[in-house]
């Protein structure tokens, strides 16, 4: 299976005020592949990632998954569940009144897992990142790095087919950033997901299978 991006164009505004943000984007990401998107501010990276996640519609072009349009005419996943697309953002966005384990189990139960299934899955994921002793604490009791690790495992809770990450290490120091990207890569490889991450940090490029450079709404060679 692959995610295929074909001739994606995105314009904002109309007439004289129209701005062309994406100008015919084409690439493929195979199952189990971890790809980094890089480019200067305003190059179209976040707009592209938002389109791939179904949060924004393109002006023209197609996104295919498993040889079928990723989204139908109502902009719903046509061959996937919404839970099959996982998002990781710059900020952790943890729910302040939920304990660490509840941040994950709630996601699992909303996707159809039983309470026992979601609890087992959450404990295993948190154990993978060394937070098994922090299950019952609240977000304000965590460090910034711990919060981000919880947010990342939350994105992987439902074994999504596609992971989209927008600068997930932007607020972390070099050591923590490396550990976070290693964690993301490991999950993508082990679960054979399709992974796309935006980052400006060139030190992290070595963890990607491929780096796609964007400039002025186009992919550069």
Swiss-Prot record:
- Keyword Heme in record: no
Q: Which Pfam families match?
A: ABC_tran
Residues annotated as binding ATP: 39-46
Q: What class of enzyme is it?
A: translocase
**Residue intervals of the ABC transporter domain:** 3-221
InterPro entries per record: AAA+_ATPase (IPR003593), ABC_transporter-like_ATP-bd (IPR003439), ABC_transpr_LolD-like (IPR015854), MacB-like_ATP-bd (IPR017911), P-loop_NTPase (IPR027417)
Keyword terms: ATP-binding, Cell membrane, Membrane, Nucleotide-binding, Translocase, Transport
Tell me the GO molecular function terms. ATP binding; ATP hydrolysis activity; transmembrane transporter activity
| PROSITE patterns according to UniProt | ABC_TRANSPORTER_2 (PS50893)
Membrane topology value: Peripheral membrane protein
Quote the subunit structure annotation.
Answer: The complex is composed of two ATP-binding proteins (HrtA), two transmembrane proteins (HrtB) and a solute-binding protein.
Provide the function of this protein.
Part of the ABC transporter complex hrt involved in hemin import. Responsible for energy coupling to the transport system.
Protein name in the entry = Putative hemin import ATP-binding protein HrtA
What organism does the UniProt record list as the source?
Staphylococcus aureus (strain Mu50 / ATCC 700699)
């Amino acid at each position: 299976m692959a995610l295929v991006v074909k001739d994606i164009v995105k314009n904002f505004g109309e007439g004289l005020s129209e701005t062309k943000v994406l100008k015919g984007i084409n690439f493929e990401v195979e199952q189990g592949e971890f790809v980094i998107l890089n480019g200067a501010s305003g190059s179209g990276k976040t707009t592209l990632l938002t389109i791939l996640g179904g949060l924004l519609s393109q002006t023209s072009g197609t996104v295919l998954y498993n040889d079928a349009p990723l989204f139908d005419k109502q902009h719903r996943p046509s061959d996937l569940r919404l839970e099959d697309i996982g998002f990781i953002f710059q900020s952790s966005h943890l729910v302040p009144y939920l304990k660490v384990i509840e941040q994950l189990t709630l996601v699992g139960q909303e996707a159809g897992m039983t309470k026992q299934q979601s609890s087992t899955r959450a404990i295993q994921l948190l154990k993978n990142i060394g937070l098994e002793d922090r299950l019952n604490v609240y977000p304000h009791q965590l460090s910034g790095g711990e919060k981000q690790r919880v947010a990342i495992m939350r994105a992987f809770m439902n074994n999504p087919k596609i992971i989209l990450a927008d600068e997930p290490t932007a607020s972390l120091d070099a050591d923590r950033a490396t550990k976070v990207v290693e964690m993301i890569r490991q999950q993508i490889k082990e679960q054979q997901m399709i992974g796309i991450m935006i980052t400006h940090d060139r030190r992290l490029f070595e963890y990607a299978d491929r780096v796609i450079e964007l400039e002025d709404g186009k992919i550069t060679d």
